[in-house]
Amino acid sequence: VIRFENVSKRYDTGQEALSRVDFHIARGEMVFLTGHSGAGKSTLMKLIMLMERPSHGQVLVGGRQTNRIRGAGIAHFRRDIGVVFQNHQLLFDRSVFDNVALPLQVAGFQVGDIGRRVRAALDKVGLLHKERQNPITLSGGEQQRVGIARAVVNKPALVLADEPTGNLDPELSAEIMTLFRQFNELGTTLVIATHDIDLIGRMNKRVLSLANGRVTSGAAPGGSQ
């Protein structure tokens, strides 16, 4: 579902964030993306999301060449991707329900459909009973679960998670990873950027490692280079 072909990204400052990156992630995989701070993880995620463009090479997502997607097509492309952020990026002036409903409202869903989908997503993450609360009243782990519900409410084929457990203790981190595994078992492709080596080891999933803008291991499904 994701393929990078000889992808490099050089910023205007001269910094080369990625250099000749090649890898393939198959549909339905759950893959961890790891590497030191500044290794290129965030840049790689931004290229998948069309928040950045490669300086060289080709990025394919769902069989589509992203360099051909322009203008209004970008927003449509992003509807098929759920994103989970480390800092949640929730709106604290809206209820939990309204936060999770946002992607559906943007996509033009009917009110009845929105209600059903939001409540199903909140039920999956164990927060249906808090749909009317303000996110600021929730714990950090609960806020992250709201972020996950928002990411999956539109039933995307692909979910990207950038350091989703970065601010959580080990027990809460394990709970979040259990949620991700459950969504993966339903067929969702997941790419999770994380520094948590212990957590990765327990999950027994493929690891795509970056160092200084290059893929050092895990470039192909099955863990081979």
Indicate residue ranges for each PLM-predicted region.
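Conserved ABC transporter NBD signature motif
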Residues: G57-T66
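Helix-to-loop junction immediately C-terminal to a conserved catalytic motif
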Residues: M49
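Catalytic Walker B motif of ABC-type/P-loop ATPase nucleotide-binding domains
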Residues: V159-D162
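Conserved signature/switch motifs of ABC ATPase nucleotide-binding domains
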Residues: Q133-I136, N154, L186
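Short coil-to-helix segment of the ABC ATPase nucleotide-binding domain corresponding to the Q-loop/switch region
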Residues: R94-A101
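Conserved ABC ATPase signature
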Residues: N134-L138, E142-Q144
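ABC ATPase NBD coupling module
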Residues: T66-G82, V111, F183-E185
